[in-house]
């Protein structure tokens, strides 16, 4: 408890902007005000009074590598607090969530969206998405906010996707990238698997510098590593937010095999708590029991908090 909050605190109030840079969401528009589009005062603040404008902390748009021709407009709300998450965060979460839902709703008819569409001209569909960052820097905070609010009942009508990002998930991605950079061996890019909706050979790419929004609060992040000294030497890295156990390791080996079919190099699976002395035999047994023995031979296990933990 609090481990992730301590790391978030090291970045301070600019943590969200720093994070966006790490995941390739560079040069986002900041501090945008848009008009509320509701004529009957449906959108209200927490005091129940009608609002006339909405604030967007960050706005980032990109063409999706997972869905052919889709322009993703990411409307970001950043809530950085010096207090820990409340013991009962549901009420405050609903306030933040509903505010973002209303903002995404009004963005659809805003002048700001028209400006975005003028810049991006090669798309066939548009997807407006909300991302709520709720972060704090208190070491005694329960970092796993998402699991606490997972069953929160939100009485609001919406037809857009909203992603929630907490301390745990931000620090997870920071840690993965810090680990890779500390190795001083690879150029990294995020891996884009085949989804059945990104099949156009003209636009299809299997990796890039932009983390798809669909992964932003994922418990697993796939990354392509290219050797600095030999670009033809490619390693497939899978980072897990959850701790090591035999079942998780087996599952991630299967996932890595399915995703990396056209890659020929090493496969690395990273956990936050892997310990060679404690887990080596468990990892060996799992690899022995994996259906594809040849593939299992290419797999190594690391603790991405420790560069010396390669198995």
Question: How would you describe each model-predicted region?
Answer:
Residues 1-55, 60-311:
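Intrinsically disordered, low-complexity Ser/Thr/Pro/Gly-rich regulatory segments
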